[in-house]
Amino acid sequence: MTDLPITDAVLREACAAFAFRGTVCDVKPCGNGHINHTFIITTDENGMRRRYILQVLNTDIFRDPDGVMENIVRVTEHIRAGLLAAGGDAERGCLHVVRSSDSTATGIAAYRYVDRDGRFWRAYDFVEHTVCRLTMDSPDTFRMVGWAFGNFQHQLSDFDASCLHESIPDFHNTKKRYAAFLDTLARDPVGRAASAAEEIAFLTARQERGSRIVDDLAAGRLPLRVTHNDTKLSNILL
C-alpha cells in the first residue's frame, strides 16, 4: 500500500468510483482502526441524507485484495439470501457491498476501485443506529457478542467454504505457527527464553495439540467450514 497522502482530490475520485445514491456532501475519517483507512461518506438525494463506509484496504497485509473482496461478496450474498428466505431484515442483518459506478465493470471489478497511486478501495452501506464498542460494558453485551458470532457460524453452516480465498496464507496454520515458535525458541535471538521458561514449558508439554485441527482437516476427519477467526468485540456492530 502506498505511503502517499490521501488528498481531497483522491477522495473525490474514490467517491465518484462507487454508485452512491445522491450527491456527496460530506467526508469524514471514521474510527480508530490500525489496519485500513476508513471514511464515512454522507450523500444528499433530494433532501434525504444517506451514509456509506468508504475504505482503503491495506494491501501490505492483504496481498490478494480481489480475493478478499470475492470472499466478502460471496459470504454476504449467502447471508442476505438466507435472511430474505427466512423473512429477516436483509438490509440491517448483513453488510451490503456498494457496486462500482462503472456499469460496464464485471466480476470483482464491479465491487472495488484502484486509484492512480494503486490504493484499493471498497465501500459499504452504513448501518445506522449501531455502535462499535472497544470495551465490554455489561454481561448483556458479552452475551450479544457471543450470539452474533454464533449466528454468523449458523448462517454459513451450509456455505461451500472451498470457494473462498485464504485472506492471509497460513495465518491460522497452527502447525506452521508452532514450528516457527520452536525455531525461534532454539535461536533465542534476543535472549528472553529464560524469562519465559514457565510459559514455554506449558506450550512444549502440549505440542501434539498444536497441529490437531490442521491434521484432521487434511485427513478429512473434520469438515471444512467458514470461520470468522477474529472474534473480538470491535468487529461487531451492536
Language model features with spans:
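Hydrophobic HxD+1 residue recognition
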Residues: T231
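ATP-dependent phospho-/nucleotidyl transfer catalytic cores
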Residues: T2-P5, K28-N32, Q55-V56, F62-D66, ...
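Juxta-kinase regulatory segment immediately upstream of eukaryotic protein kinase catalytic domains
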Residues: M1-K28
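Conserved hydrophobic/aromatic beta-strand scaffold that supports enzyme active sites
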Residues: T38-I40, A123, V226
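ATP-binding pocket architecture of kinase catalytic cores
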Residues: M48-N71, E77-C163
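ATP-binding glycine-rich phosphate-binding loop
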Residues: G22-D44
